[in-house]
Amino acid sequence: YSDDEIEVVLAHELAHHVYGDIWKGLLFETGLIAGGFLLASFVLGAAVGLFGIRDAGDIAALPALLLGAGAVSLVAVPAAHAMSRAHERRADRFALTLTGNGPAFVSAMRRLAAQNMAEDEPSPLVQWLFHSHPPIRERIEAAQEFQRGTGSGTAMADRHDRDDTSVTKKGR
């Protein structure tokens, strides 16, 4: 990776710190886990007496628990991934605004995609179910729009220029 590519990737990661994405993700996923345990408790409570299940600790309750966990996962995992993709898009805009180096961003995305054997454009269903990051093609197109001045990074740059505690743009 070139120095410019490293700078863009580092700026992207810095955005996660600036916006508190790790803490937000931890809180969100903790809430999902707590909600999952609560739902599991209800499922096990409802399963007692059915199918010969004597109490929540009965091994016969395990299939009911697994079905409940699967149902929770069908909602919780895509929700967590959607939040993560939003954080990634925002971090991309931050990196582009901070560095102003769209070509290095595009180059870094292409190299990372090749290194990780990422699919350029997964189906919407696959993305919704399994991807915590936006598709590479979408990220590259957003960077190219940003470079043409049609991207959505300007408001972010203005907000950071007014914030005394933020990182300033390169070259200022």
Describe each PLM feature range.
Residues R54-G68:
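Hydrophobic alpha-helical transmembrane segments
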Residues L66-P78:
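Hydrophobic alpha-helical transmembrane segments of polytopic membrane proteins
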Residues Y1-A56, V75-R172:
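Polar-ligand-bearing catalytic/cofactor-coordination segments
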